């Protein structure tokens, strides 16, 4: 038969012994403050103490002292009280420190409780936020006239009381009525003076809507000017003169920060304008490189896959990018600095020949050809003709490519680990226009 109260009674007795320093055989020093405890209790409750006390298990006759600098005494007090009572005193101010100390002491139960506490606190704050906005929406619907007078009360003129009290929804404190005249603000208590001008309410609503739409989008000064012209032309039947209307709109636009827009009632929502910033949408699956265009991602993937789809028609060397091929051709071949591959001496079409060895082609001078033996090396006469200056009929085509070479290089590379299929295509037309493909000479 199990007695459930025995465990709590035993913990209570151990806690009393700790408070009275009875049979305490372990001292914990935390930033100069000493805590007394029992080694058996610490051994059973903390993985760190279990490892620490196991190393000194042979010296049980002497008291053990442990020193910590990773957390504060107040934090360790909360943890030690939990060890002896099973009650964890968490608040919004100490939950992070307690969770950090519990992680250091390898107390998984305390870490789980701290995580649950943080999550529940976030849920409560979200619920309170939703409740606040729902109440503000209801108040805005029930007090629409007062809300409209809060933002557009400057359309009418009238004397205000020397001092007026703000309602709790608008703020607290006492504000002078005349001090708000330059901001076109009239408190809600002046509703009686605004009733004779109720015929301007549709006009004010339209201006508020226009202002909301204009401020909710990233705009410059030109947008504000265009919105002013739209407001002036949209309602020509207004009894307010053009000069008063222009002055009112200017005051409203100038007094409103660009990064904010009005919501219902007195709610103000911050706008960060994320559409103005470039969106990086393509991420490399092999590294952290991020690009804006798919063509740039395909070009970047060649450094991982080792693809070299652009061969040099003069020497057969392959490149991963078209601009690298163009730079190679300009600096090596088009510069007319033909050298022998073996002796590195300058050669011409008369003093050297093009030799093809497998897929590679290079030049050798006549002396080096005589050393190797001209019969033992294959001479590519057709390649030598390609290295000559192109004929007049071929000047329009910058590259002397066959029909098979003119096809776009399309290769499929499959990566089983990432389940990624990469299709390499030609660079965009924009890049092709920028690239200069010189004649082979």
UniProtKB/Swiss-Prot annotation:
Residues that bear Phosphoserine: 161, 167
Gene Ontology CC entries for this record: nucleus
Low complexity composition bias: residue spans: 234-243
Biased composition (Polar residues): 143-170, 178-196
Name of a matching Pfam family: zf-C2H2
Region (Disordered): 143-251
Domain of life the protein comes from: Eukaryota
A GO molecular-function annotation: DNA-binding transcription factor activity, RNA polymerase II-specific
Annotated signal sequence range: none
Protein name: Zinc finger and BTB domain-containing protein 8A
Species for this entry: Homo sapiens
